[in-house]
Amino acid sequence: MKTLAAFLLLSCLIAGEVNGQDRSSRARCFCVDKGLNMVLLKNLDKVEIFPPSPSCNKHEIVVTLKNGAGQKCLNPDSKFTKNVVLKAIGKRMQQSVPHSTTTGTVKSSMTSSTSAPTAFK
């Protein structure tokens, strides 16, 4: 009987430790505030777009600056940020279709169904 009780107790302890996500990692966003409204374009090295995810419910846009100046968050609602994202998407589309002679418009959409970050250089 003691063996059965010990087995049940051990099973409950193991089952209690198995979880899908650590509670301490919830709501961990890279950007702690709303971010900058603009940065100098000549200082931009890379633009990363992070859609909302289980670990962060905000849409984040992080830019890496040249010359080791680090990373900064951009305000996703600012006009400057939307223009930077449009240029980055347009540049990426041109790189993926180098022999295309057609032109089109790119519409800004800050919603995404995937949770993987998108990076543009």
UniProtKB/Swiss-Prot annotation:
Low complexity biased stretches: 100-115
Any GO CC annotation of this UniProt entry: extracellular space
Keywords: Chemotaxis, Cytokine, Disulfide bond, Secreted, Signal
Main location: secreted
PROSITE patterns: SMALL_CYTOKINES_CXC
UniProt xrefs under InterPro entries: Chemokine_b/g/d, Chemokine_CXC, Chemokine_CXC_CS, Chemokine_IL8-like_dom, CXC_Chemokine_domain, Interleukin_8-like_sf
UniProt-listed Gene3D superfamilies: 2.40.50.40
Example of a GO biological process term: defense response
Subcellular location: Secreted
CDD domains linked to this entry: Chemokine_CXC (cd00273)
Induction: Up-regulated in response to bacterial infection by S.typhimurium or M.marinum.
A single MF term (Gene Ontology): chemokine activity
Signal peptide as annotated in the record: 1-20
Cystines in this chain: C29-C56, C31-C73
Region (Disordered): 95-121
Family, similarity comment: Belongs to the intercrine alpha (chemokine CxC) family.
Function: Ligand for cxcr3.2. Chemotactic for macrophages.
Name of this protein: C-X-C motif chemokine 11-6
